[in-house]
Structure formats: C-alpha cells, structure tokens
C-alpha cells in the first residue's frame, strides 16, 4: 500500500508545485500588464489634457479682445476641432465673460472653485445635462480659462482592453471610473495600485490582479498545465515501475491482496449422473490491473510460505459472502460453498471466530459451508485442533480433506479428525482410461472411503470414460473441465440462472 501511495503523492506534489510556479509567473505577468494598462490610460488622459492646454492658448488671445460673434465663433471652432473638448469658458474676475457656445451659455449649473490644482472632476449634479465632466483650468492674471471634457472621452481613455481590471481616474480626492458618477473618497482608498501623470495633477488607480486565479490559469496557461500534468503522471509511472521492480515477490503479493486483486473464481460441483449443479469450490485468481489472470499455482505456494495465505483467504471469504448474498434467492437449498484453508490458517488463534463470522454473514442458513483442509502443509493434529474443527462441525460446517492422497499424512487425518468428505485429487482421476489397471489405486481409495463412511468428491473429471467410471462407482459429486472450468462470479450467475433450482441431498 505504501509503495502504491508514494507515486501518487509524488505526482500530486509535482503537479501542485508546477501549478504554484506557473501561477506566480502568470501573476507577475498580469501585474506587469495591469501596470502597462494604467500607463496607457494615463497617456490617453495626458493627450486629452494636452488638447485642453492648447485650447487655453487660443482663449487667452481672444480674452485680450472683445467677446463678439466672431470671437465666439473662433472659440467654438477651437472646441470643435479638438476631438475631446466640449466647451471653452473665459472668466474675468470670476464672471463668465465669453464661451464657445452661442449666447455665452455654459453647461455648468455653477462655476466651481478649483483647489490647488488645474484639474477638477465635476459631478453630474453640477452640470445642466446631468453628466459628469473633467475641467481643465489655466490662469492668466485676472483671466481664468476653463475647458470642459466630456465623461465619455474620459471613460474611453480608461477603457483599456485588459480583462479583470478596472482603471479609475483620480483628481485630488475625487474619482471617476468606466461607469457611474464622480465620487469623493473621503479618506477611503479601495484601490491599492496607482500611476501618477508626470505632466498633470491626476492619478490612474486600480487594484492588482488576484494572487490566484483559476480563470487566468486556464486562459493563459492551459498548455503548460497539460504539460505539468503529463510530467507528474510520467513521474508517478516511473516511480511505480521502480517500486514494482525493486519490491520483493512477497511485497507485490501483499499489495495485490490489499488492492483487492486476488479475486474468487468458482468451479461448479455437479451431480455426475444428472448434471445438476450441487455447489461450488472457491479458487483464488490474481487479477492483473491491465487484464488477464494469474494461476494460483504461481502465487499460492508463496502465500503459504510467507504467511500471506491467511489475509488472502480472509479477503476471499469477504468477497464470497458478499457475492453469494447478492444471488442468495437463486441458490438451491443445501448448496455447497467450499473454501480451501491451509494448515497455517487453521492453527491461527482467530480461525474459529473468522469461520463463524463468515457463516453469520450469509443471509441464508440452509447453505452448506465446506471447509476444505489442504494437504500442502503438514497439519499438527492435537487436542486443540480437534476441538476447533469439532466446534465448527457442531455449528453446521462441513469438513472436507482436499487433494486426498497427494500431501501430508492423509490417512492419519482420517483417523484423528471428523472428516465429512474426501476430495480425490485429479492426479488419480486423470489416470482412469480403458485399461483396468489404471484404476487400481483409485479403487483402493474409494473402498477405504466406503469403509469409513466418508462421502467422496471427485476432482479433475475431463473425459467421458472418467465420468462413466465414477458413476459406476456411485461417486455423486464431481467437478472438472468435463462439466465446467473455474469461472468468474458473473459467469457463475449465468450458470445458476440457466439451471433449475434442485434441493441438494448429501449422498
């Protein structure tokens, strides 16, 4: 489990680090863009005020003359030829003397008083048409020249084509943005960044880009994000390959058990005469992540040698109970479910409790749970062992001796333990052919079982000759490729649904 998590954690850390670095770079880039945009807006305002400054020079020349129709026409022409100017007003001793509008009209409801600056933002309430304006002032002795600039031109100058930023013009303590009226800050400064004009008394203020922006990452760095993700996945893949290569077979098997890669296969047990389904033997298979299965012959000996056979069997028990409960209503009464148990598992302190919990996890109580004792390891038969198996037998478990005759002390087990079934190994059944000599050993085994009143299950039935021999000798329970090979749970469900439910009677 640890070796599985490390590549994943490394990949996550690499991806997060890469995203963090990319985000910082994009943030600095966005800050530079915002600053460049503010300078661009300031430059736009400078150009507008440059027009206003030039217009005041013309107005000064007119102020030295008479304010007649010709002079008003000249003022109007000056205002019209300057694309960003609205009106020009000449004041003498604080009184409107001449304007660029006919009849010396002004669009101000009152003449404002300028602070210590030549710029002033007038709110909509101070204008006739209720639109805010920017005023530029130039003072010559007792003559004041006022130039008004429409809010549309100011907003246009502030409208820099950058997403996510709002530029605001600040004059003294008043501000105007791309929308809305003139506002007074009154000591409250919601904007943290600013660019000062080097020519006029105004400032472009704005807020910096957010430190983290998912939209910015996708919009500006999508390609790099994909590259970072590929690098992180490649690192995880290489680490996983490294750990798998350097891990011992035992560690690899332990990881497979923890990851649920050891799954149950089911080989049906049938009535050899009728072909009816009587039960299943649970067999372990190692499911590969990329498809395919590994035979138990490749990993069961390692599991027994390393002690992993116990957690492996526990995992199978949990899976079998869950799967059988899902189709419990489809199983015939007395259906056999057999699981192999090694000697090391049987002598473990928790074995009896595990088996009882296994039984209690089934929703049906009329199933025959078969404990198949394997002979691959020697089993030390003592009083404690006999007591354990007797407890399980009394609680409804059926005890079977698997692969009889191929392992350790099979005959002594028959003498010392309460055995309900012996399962004749396929190596004996496989010898059966037309030659009478081929069945001598098997005949002896069958005769022994009958004398001890022990039922028999024949494994490895593959030919019609073997089937006929077993039926002639009244061996009811049979399993092998002649009937069914070991199948997945899904295939077992299909088999069960295709067969009528028949009560299983022990014969």
Swiss-Prot record:
<dbReference type="InterPro" id="IPR001633">
    <property type="entry name" value="EAL_dom"/>
</dbReference>
<dbReference type="GO" id="GO:0005886">
    <property type="term" value="C:plasma membrane"/>
</dbReference>
<dbReference type="Pfam" id="PF00563">
    <property type="entry name" value="EAL"/>
</dbReference>
<dbReference type="InterPro" id="IPR024744">
    <property type="entry name" value="CSS-motif_dom"/>
</dbReference>
<keyword id="KW-1133">Transmembrane helix</keyword>
<keyword id="KW-0378">Hydrolase</keyword>
<keyword id="KW-1003">Cell membrane</keyword>
<keyword id="KW-0812">Transmembrane</keyword>
<keyword id="KW-0472">Membrane</keyword>
<feature type="transmembrane region" description="Helical">
    <location>
        <begin position="4"/>
        <end position="24"/>
    </location>
</feature>
<dbReference type="Pfam" id="PF12792">
    <property type="entry name" value="CSS-motif"/>
</dbReference>
<protein>
    <recommendedName>
        <fullName>Probable cyclic di-GMP phosphodiesterase PdeG</fullName>
        <ecNumber>3.1.4.52</ecNumber>
    </recommendedName>
</protein>
<feature type="domain" description="EAL">
    <location>
        <begin position="246"/>
        <end position="500"/>
    </location>
</feature>
<feature type="transmembrane region" description="Helical">
    <location>
        <begin position="217"/>
        <end position="237"/>
    </location>
</feature>
<comment type="function">
    <text>Phosphodiesterase (PDE) that catalyzes the hydrolysis of cyclic-di-GMP (c-di-GMP) to 5'-pGpG.</text>
</comment>
<dbReference type="GO" id="GO:0071111">
    <property type="term" value="F:cyclic-guanylate-specific phosphodiesterase activity"/>
</dbReference>
<dbReference type="GO" id="GO:1900190">
    <property type="term" value="P:regulation of single-species biofilm formation"/>
</dbReference>
<keyword id="KW-0973">c-di-GMP</keyword>
<dbReference type="InterPro" id="IPR050706">
    <property type="entry name" value="Cyclic-di-GMP_PDE-like"/>
</dbReference>
<dbReference type="InterPro" id="IPR035919">
    <property type="entry name" value="EAL_sf"/>
</dbReference>
